[in-house]
Amino acid sequence: MSTKRLFSLILAVAMLAAIVAGCTNQNGAPISSPPAEETAAPVQSEQPTQSEEPQQVSATGKGTLTFARTESIATLNPHMYTSDIESCCIEYTGAALYGYFYNDDKSGVSLRACIADGEPIKMNDNGTVWQIKISPDARWANGEAITADDFMYSFKMLLDPKLVNGRGGAFAEDYIKILNAKAYYTQTEAEGAVPTWEDVGIKKVDDMTIEITTSIAQDATEVMSHLAYAWTVPVYEEMYESLMNSDRTATTYGTDIDKVVCSGAFTYNAWERDAEISFKKNPEYIKQDMIQIEKLVMKIIPDRGTQLQMFEAGELDYVELNSSQFKDYEEDPRVLYSPSIYVKYMPVNVNNPDNPILSDVNFRKALFLAVDRESIAKLHPRPR
């Protein structure tokens, strides 16, 4: 288990506030689960004075936020990403049906509609059929409307048994279990027959409405949470198809910034592999009035010590510290506690053929009874 907690030194709090809620999930992170609980982190001692009158937000934004990450980026395809940094890039540039946004007083975040036009509508008494309407204001970065067809195509490709997209299994079953989705994705029998796409519980009702049928009863929050993940961000059909190979087993969608169409808060500006990726504000984003910053610059710096040196030299606007580095900054007036990644729970892969003992429930109980809970609890940083 990783016991490392992340702490942040933040010099540009006002700029960061506009985007931090967009990447509080965790899929290695991310990014698209609910935001992590508060951990420690640092800020400039004086924050900008807030005007009593609301300020007009520019369609292009103002200012640049420069920060660093340790990982490299392999793909920008929401169906195939594997790392936290890839999830964050997709969440910066893609809009899902639902997402986590600041509440009115910015004291926390809440799960709200993004591209969706309101909460899911329960269509039967037992909570297995849900309709989601798409906002008429939802747009791709190229100005085209986002419709039900975009989500139908995206979800079909995500579950496509020939593409075998890495995120298809989680989309089939996570917060909710979509009817026949897993059996279609894995091409295994469901009630005696391998289902076709038409058997999967995802249907188009009209141009701006989709309907999802689940195999068990679900509630609205579960449906919204499931449809807030980064892998549910829509892909642009025309480009996705144009980049498909001849036997339809792979697409190069998302392998470069000119091979993806954005729908989120930012669009891709430039990408120098293993060095830097930058983003610029998307004026077509449905919630663009919430985004105050013009540009993000994410540098790839594997060594955290180097990141800290760059921060102190003024080359980065904030830096994340591991627990050992934090000891030197614990009393620094710039320290601020902010939402960050943390260990929620440890799942056990009960289906791993290389470790069949993990399928034994009594072994798993013994495993967790052996965990030293007191030592783990002591690792939590003291409250400030």
Residue ranges and their predicted role:
Residues 23-33:
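Bacterial lipoprotein signal-peptidase II cleavage site
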Residues 3-6, 18, 22, 128, ...:
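Extracytoplasmic/periplasmic ligand-capture domains
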Residues 40-65:
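N-terminal low-complexity, Pro/Thr/Ser-rich intrinsically disordered segments
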Residues 166-242:
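Surface-exposed binding/hinge segments that line
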Residues 102-103, 197-198, 216-218, 225-291, ...:
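Gly/Pro-rich hinge or "lid" segments in bacterial periplasmic/extracellular proteins
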Residues 69-91, 115-116, 166, 221-234, ...:
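A structural "hinge/loop" feature
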Residues 68-125, 261-262:
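N-terminal lobe/hinge region of extracytoplasmic solute-binding protein
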Residues 11, 15-19:
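Hydrophobic core
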